[in-house]
């Protein structure tokens, strides 16, 4: 029997293997013959598990980028794809990734087969979720490695992964430190938002990653604003790539169903316009972009305290990864909410049903503008975008026209404007932390303007700095100095490449910082001024500023008119007298008794036990009238106290009655201590000594029947030694 079972199992495995080989051969032949574009996923030469997963996820019709990319990617060609935001680029590389590994018979023993690199953690998480949704019926193992997660757990599971979705910094860390991480068998490399990964912020990181990957592989690059630089393509070793740009000939670089507006507003009225917009759009889902983390936090904290009537969220790169994931999930599931964020949300993230995208601060270039407004009007859904420009930033409109982006000018009626300057001043006055955050937001905004590359648009010298500080509610203008940078051009590149996406992007700077590991004790001893604010806060405002009210406990008077001690100094002739003179207890008999005094409003000392003179007593009135009035006041006080005492006694009696009734009810129900354990005030009425119900546990050889057998021991069978020993123990127990 076992031989036949084994034979059938081997035959079944061989049959299944032949069927898979025949299926793969048929798929390869269909892919080679694929020439016409198809409109539905069911018409593509895909495996049945992939088709079922696509159908269950309600992916039926192909988008333009998917029609052109998927057939070429299935044939193993390198691809450079560009399409508008919200056009389905993620699915355009997820489907070929799964199918190509399946046709190559990739298993867990073959190691890493595909690598997907995303510039931000949130985009990597979203890509991984899509991968799991489409490939859940296949047997591949997939992993997500991003900054903020446990490095040791990732390192242990890394060798078993076939597909990895990652950020550049964490991937390079594993390549340098993980011994079991082998990339020699890599088949596919995919760069999502490739133009962002290829820029200066990830230059050394990407070069280090590519140098450890095999040259012969399939490479695919996707973005809404794609690069065609020969130098960048040579870095990635692309071999005759297919340039696919489905919207290159369109009249606009943004979706046609996106309504785009701009508003010219002074710097001092930006927050007023934003708060008024939120108050009038309570039934919408809105994203507000700002240029720095400090600005995001200041606007969120102040608006949250002013309660505009809608849920507020904030997201920036300085938050922990768990917080960022929770905020992203909450914003995705909410219908009416406002999200204040930096550019970590600008690329690739797919938030459903976003109605408005507001750019409170102008983007650094047109590509950033396209990615920002791409968070709305996705998948043929309508959306709205509003750009707030300063009068000195109107040159940015020419940059938009050069990329075929038309925006409509709107104006705000004076009657609709509401100033929140007084409220911001009140918040900064009451809360020192809000004032500190506002000062940091002020500095970070000016720093971002100073480090921008396009000086025709961003002009720091034309900004009303003092009026801007006043509009934030600050008591004074913080000091800010722009020192001479050693390498100004490099600093601009670093700022535009790394700070625009904050610390969420895993740039090479992050990787270098991770090499210098600090222990928990190092961080504890490095802490300063934990109970108030950071040490550098004092340098934000002029020390002699008359408007600064943040200092608590200031010296008002330096020299006091204190009476000087007169008299000769006591000179002791012996050590005993000197010791006695230094003893307070011994010197008390030489000092007069202390007088208890109190001070009036003018600071005059008045004896506490000063006796009234006869004149003052006569001025108070007739003694009999004083006695009568005093007795009347005391009588009223006693009557009030009597009412309170009666109510207290009444409540105690009611509580005692309630306890007694509760105890009677428990007694009537015949509740045992095992069934009911009284709690609260009832415990006082229950005896502490409760009868024990548990009995001594019987041994294995004792009879479970509690009835008396009268000393009779029943014997059934004594064939074994164990039975005889059991009988002897029973007889001994009966005796």
Swiss-Prot record:
One of its GO terms (molecular function) is RNA helicase activity. Residues 1-24, 483-513, 652-712 are annotated as: Disordered. It catalyses: ATP + H2O = ADP + phosphate + H(+). Residues 8-19, 692-711 have a biased composition (Basic and acidic residues). It holds the Pfam family Helicase_C. Residues 70-244 form the Helicase ATP-binding domain. One of its GO terms (biological process) is rRNA processing. The modification Phosphoserine is found at residues 500, 503-504, 545. Its EC number is 3.6.4.13. A motif (DEAD box) lies at residues 192-195. One of its GO terms (cellular component) is small-subunit processome. Belongs to the DEAD box helicase family. DDX10/DBP4 subfamily. This is ATP-dependent RNA helicase dbp4.
